[in-house]
Structures are given as structure tokens and as C-alpha cells.
From Swiss-Prot:
One of its GO terms (cellular component) is cytosol. The active site is at 61 (proton acceptor), 72 (proton acceptor). This is Tryptophan synthase alpha chain. GO terms for biological process: L-tryptophan biosynthetic process. GO terms for molecular function: tryptophan synthase activity. Signal peptide: none annotated. The alpha subunit is responsible for the aldol cleavage of indoleglycerol phosphate to indole and glyceraldehyde 3-phosphate. Its EC number is 4.2.1.20. Belongs to the TrpA family. The gene is trpA.
Length: 278
């Protein structure tokens, strides 16, 4: 293990850097959808991801199904349960990730998951598998930056960008730590609480964005409650590098899970509309 951590493996944050540079040159922001791998089934999950990318997603944020998601609202919990019912294991998730990476060599791919999944087979082993599958970044939702040292170490040993959440109620100390420890991008919460499609992303974020800039944080993407194009434009106007939409995307999967044609058409339409707002 030591030999690995002593080598300098190039950071996967470079795919994010390339994407953000390209968007900056175009004068646009990023639209990043979130879905749970394997929802509603591993096969359809791949088609869903193809649809998101082909209709303008600038990066992907992907979850591993987990049966006790503390920070997730009912929509994402539903996605977890559907994926688990379809037999989506962590091994199946890594296989899906490798396929996605092979198809889209330049696309930034991030994981958003819970510490239990990372602990299951050892922290280092998880990051090694993530690196092998072509993952660029890992955000562990229930590990604050203050407790993240072992995860950061494993991430860096395997050339993966550790991502941190900047909560809306964070003090300067926390924002400084998030800025120093994070790579790739910063996940900026538009409000505290659980994820959901209904609540407006109404927290004034300009102040946090100014602080993150002052601390030279990786580009901030605004997440939580992003369900409409107007919220994407507002996030970018406020100074975010883009927006992440999870529950709104998963809601479409939930609604049309029995009808593949309608499902992919609705996801394509949603992605195009959200991307157009960047």
C-alpha cells in the first residue's frame, strides 16, 4: 500500500478543470444532474446516463444505492430502494462506472455517497476501485471536512478529488477548511436539511460564494432544491460555477419508470431546458 501512496498519481481534478475552463471560455456555467446508479435497473440506468450526457450534462454526480440515506428526501430514498430491488450492488456500480468512463473519456464523473459504503471493504480499497473505474471525485455526504483526514489521504493516494460541502450556515473556519481540502469543485448547499424537489433554493448564497472565492476554493456548484431553469440562472448569476440537480431528475425517473420511451424523452427535455439556462 505504501508504494502506491508514495507515487504521485495525476489528479483526476484535471477533468473538472478542463470542463470549467471550456465553460468559462463559452461564458456559461455547468449543469450537473445527479442519479442513483442502478435506478430503476442497471440496464436502464446506463440509458438514462447516456440521455443526460447527450442532452447537455457537463458532468455527472452519481450515487451508490444505500438503504438508509440520512440526508435524502423521499424522492432519492425511492431511487435507492428501486436500485437495490433491481439487485444493484457496489460491484455492479463500479462496472457501470467503468462503462460510462469508457464511453465518455473527458466527462467529469463524481460520486456522492455515504461513509458506510466506503468503510465496507476498507477506505483505501474503495478509492482504488473508484480510480480503476475512472471516477474523478468522491463526496461523502455524512463526513464533514473536520473528520475527513483518512478519506482525503486515500483519495489523494488514488488521484481522486475529495469534494466537500459548504453548508449555508458555515463559519469562516469551516469554509477555509473546505476550500483548502477540496479539489475539483465545491458542493455549495443552497439550504440546510434534506434534499428535495419542492423547496426553493432561496438562501442568499452570495456571501458564501464571496468567502469561497476569498479562500480560493475549487469552483462552487450549487445543489439542493434545484428543479427549474430559473434557479440555474440565478445560481450562476450569483457567482456559482453551475448547479447540481438531483431530486428533480430522480422524480422524472420515478414518474416514468414503467415507460422507457417516455422516461428518456422527459429526461432529455429536462436536461436541455436546464442546460439552456446556464
Amino acid at each position: 500500500m505504501n508504494s502506491i501512496s508514495n507515487q504521485t498519481i495525476p489528479h483526476q481534478a484535471s477533468r473538472y478543470q478542463a470542463a470549467f475552463s471550456r465553460l468559462k471560455a463559452e461564458g456559461r456555467g455547468a449543469f450537473v444532474p445527479f442519479v442513483t446508479l442502478g435506478d430503476p435497473s442497471p440496464e436502464l440506468s446506463l440509458k438514462i446516463i447516456d440521455t443526460l450526457v447527450q442532452n447537455g450534462a457537463d458532468a455527472l454526480e452519481l450515487g451508490f444505492p444505500f438503504s438508509d440515506p440520512l440526508a435524502d428526501g423521499p424522492v432519492i430514498q425511492g431511487a435507492n430502494l428501486r436500485a437495490l430491488a433491481a439487485g444493484t450492488t457496489p460491484t455492479a456500480c463500479f462496472e457501470l462506472l467503468a462503462k460510462i468512463r469508457a464511453k465518455y473519456p473527458e466527462l467529469p464523473i463524481g460520486l456522492l455517497l455515504y461513509a458506510n459504503l466506503v468503510f465496507a471493504n476498507g477506505i483505501d480499497a474503495f478509492y482504488a476501485k473508484a480510480q480503476q473505474a475512472g471516477v474523478d471525485s468522491v463526496l461523502i455526504a455524512d463526513v464533514p471536512v473536520e473528520e475527513a483526514a483518512p478519506f482525503i489521504q486515500a483519495a489523494k493516494a488514488h488521484g481522486i478529488a475529495p469534494i466537500f460541502i459548504a453548508p449555508p450556515n458555515a463559519d469562516s473556519d469551516t469554509l477555509a477548511k473546505v476550500s483548502q481540502s477540496g479539489e475539483g469543485y465545491t458542493y455549495l448547499l443552497s439550504r440546510a436539511g434534506v434534499t428535495g424537489a419542492d423547496t426553493k433554493a432561496g438562501t442568499p448564497v452570495e456571501e458564501i460564494l464571496a468567502k469561497l472565492q476569498e479562500f480560493n476554493a475549487p469552483p462552487p456548484l450549487l445543489g439542493f432544491g434545484i428543479a427549474e431553469p430559473a434557479q440555474v440562472s440565478a445560481a450562476i448569476k450569483a457567482g456559482a460555477a453551475g448547479a447540481i440537480s438531483g431530486s428533480a431528475v430522480v422524480k422524472i425517473i420515478e414518474t416514468h419508470q414503467q415507460d422507457e420511451v417516455k422516461l428518456l424523452a422527459a429526461l432529455g427535455e429536462f436536461t436541455r431546458t436546464m442546460k439552456a439556462a446556464t
